[in-house]
Amino acid sequence: MPKRSPPDTSPVARFEQSLQELEQLVQNMETGALSLEQSLGAYERGIALYRECHQALEQAQLRVRILSDPMHPDDGEPFDPSLVSTSQ
C-alpha cells in the first residue's frame, strides 16, 4: 500500500477552508441570534481566520512573483514558505 503524504497545512492550502468558515461566522453574527458571549467568541475566531487568509494571500502573491519575474523568466525558482515573514 503506498504511503500517503501528510496533508499540506500551509496557509495557502487552508485558504478556502478558512474563508468558508469566516463567511459562515459572518452569516451567524449577522442574524443577531448569538448571545454577546457567542458573538465575542465568533469575532475573535473571525479575526484569527482573517489573519490566516491574509497571510495565505500574501504567500500566494509572493509565490507568483517569484515564479513569474518578467525581467528574469528563466530564473523561476520553487517557492519556500519558510522565507515568508509570519509576523503582523
Swiss-Prot record:
It comes from the Bacteria. Pfam families: Exonuc_VII_S. One of its GO terms (molecular function) is exodeoxyribonuclease VII activity. One of its GO terms (biological process) is DNA catabolic process. Keywords: Cytoplasm, Exonuclease, Hydrolase, Nuclease. GO terms for cellular component: cytosol; exodeoxyribonuclease VII complex. It is found in: Cytoplasm. The keyword Hydrolase applies. It is an enzyme of class 3 (hydrolase). The keyword Transcription does not apply. Gene3D superfamilies: Exonuclease VII, small subunit. It catalyses: Exonucleolytic cleavage in either 5'- to 3'- or 3'- to 5'-direction to yield nucleoside 5'-phosphates. Residues 69-88 are annotated as: Disordered. Its EC number is 3.1.11.6. PANTHER family: EXODEOXYRIBONUCLEASE 7 SMALL SUBUNIT (PTHR34137:SF1). HAMAP family: Exonuc_7_S (MF_00337). Heterooligomer composed of large and small subunits. Bidirectionally degrades single-stranded DNA into large acid-insoluble oligonucleotides, which are then degraded further into small acid-soluble oligonucleotides. Belongs to the XseB family. This is Exodeoxyribonuclease 7 small subunit. It comes from Xylella fastidiosa (strain Temecula1 / ATCC 700964).
